[in-house]
């Protein structure tokens, strides 16, 4: 017997039986579905924490605001500055390490850092860097 047209055509807005529905029904198996034979317990989902990316960004921004309060910096500019600081840090640390080994010592002191800065940076820039570094170390030791 042929079926009536109302039985074969689905109602407006509802999906056909057997075809996948757009909304995931709680009865069907999915990521959050209960497993049969487990006593109705749900498995604890362990969420991975996002790894923290270390950056000098906040410090670069603070220095920028001290020097030019009305100036901003783009994320690309911040990335360049961060790379620059990491590069200089690595160079100074490497040079200070070589100086420490050359003097047969096991600890990098402020003196090695100062000498490394003098060796790496040219002329006036080295003088200003040493004076600012000395000022920062003095401020730190007096605040302790």
Curated annotation (Swiss-Prot):
Motif (SPKK motif 4): 19-22
A molecular-function term among this protein's GO annotations: DNA binding
InterPro entries associated with the record: Histone-fold, Histone_H2A/H2B/H3, Histone_H2B, HISTONE_H2B_site
Segments carrying motif SPKK motif 5: 25-28
Cellular component, GO, one term: nucleus
Stored Pfam families: Histone (PF00125)
Gene3D superfamilies given in the database record: Histone, subunit A
Annotated compartments: Nucleus; Chromosome
Glycosylation sites: 131
Motif SPKK motif 3, chain ranges: 14-17
Modification type Phosphoserine: residues: 14, 19, 25
UniProt entry keywords in alphabetical sequence: Chromosome, DNA-binding, Glycoprotein, Isopeptide bond, Nucleosome core, Nucleus, Phosphoprotein, Ubl conjugation
Motif residue range(s): SPKK motif 2: 9-12
Stretches the record annotates as Disordered: 1-51
PTMs per UniProt: Monoubiquitination of Lys-139 gives a specific tag for epigenetic transcriptional activation and is also prerequisite for histone H3 'Lys-4' and 'Lys-79' methylation.
Cross-link (Glycyl lysine isopeptide (Lys-Gly) (interchain with G-Cter in ubiquitin)): 139
Compositionally biased spans, kind Basic residues: 24-51
Motif SPKK motif 1 location, chain numbering: 4-7
Family named by the database record: Belongs to the histone H2B family.
Function (record text): Core component of nucleosome. Nucleosomes wrap and compact DNA into chromatin, limiting DNA accessibility to the cellular machineries which require DNA as a template. Histones thereby play a central role in transcription regulation, DNA repair, DNA replication and chromosomal stability. DNA accessibility is regulated via a complex set of post-translational modifications of histones, also called histone code, and nucleosome remodeling.
Assembly mode: The nucleosome is a histone octamer containing two molecules each of H2A, H2B, H3 and H4 assembled in one H3-H4 heterotetramer and two H2A-H2B heterodimers. The octamer wraps approximately 147 bp of DNA.
Domain observations: Contains 5 SPKK motifs which may interact with the minor groove of A/T-rich DNA sites. Phosphorylation of this motif may regulate DNA binding. This motif is reiterated in both termini of histone H1 and in the C-terminus of plant H2A, but its presence in the N-terminus seems to be unique to sea urchin histones H2B.
Stated name of the protein: Histone H2B.2, sperm
Lineage: Eukaryota, Metazoa, Echinodermata, Eleutherozoa, Echinozoa
